[in-house]
Design a protein with these regions (language model features):
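Bacterial N-terminal signal peptides that target proteins for export
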Residues: 1-8
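Detector for intrinsically disordered, low-structure N-terminal pre-sequences
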Residues: 8-10, 23
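An acidic-aromatic pocket/loop used at catalytic or ligand-binding sites
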Residues: 18-136
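C-terminal motif of bacterial Sec signal peptides marking the signal peptidase cleavage site
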Residues: 13-16
């Protein structure tokens, strides 16, 4: 009986120490970092590409405090050259942050459900010749 108990404890301890490899954060735009702890929900997300425009509405979910998530987004986006235009917070609709960068726009909506904190990122970017015309 003691052997069985010792074996059971050992097996439980070893399986508790096992970990899955970290998920790579997915972002359709290389200059829009996604904070760790968020998982993309591809069933709710939409990505559209044309010769002149790339647009995406991507949903992420996680168990992160919304206020700290808002600070993390603002800090990392500004570090990547995004200009913060505005932020609004509403008790029933969460926090909306709006950013711009040459040829690109981004809206980040952070809100809570009963279990997850959700992030809805809507981004558009001019690509190809349309982007070159904007720079002139």
């Amino acid at each position: 009986m003691r052997r069985f108990l010792a074996l059971s404890v050992t097996v439980l301890a070893l399986t508790a120490c096992a970990s899955t490899p970290p998920k790579v954060q997915r972002s359709e735009f290389e200059d829009i970092p996604v904070p760790k702890g968020l998982a993309v929900d591809l069933n709710r997300s939409t990505i559209i590409e044309s010769p002149t425009v790339k647009a995406a509405r991507i949903f992420y979910k996680g168990r992160i405090e919304p206020d700290s998530l808002g600070v993390a987004f603002r800090t990392t986006l500004e570090a990547n050259g995004w200009k913060h235009l505005s932020s609004t917070t509403s008790s029933d609709k969460g926090t909306t942050q709006v950013y711009e960068k040459q040829g690109s726009s981004l809206q980040v909506l952070i809100y809570e459900s009963w279990y997850y904190t959700w992030v809805e990122m809507s981004a558009t970017r001019m690509v190809g010749s349309a982007s070159a015309q904007l720079r002139q």
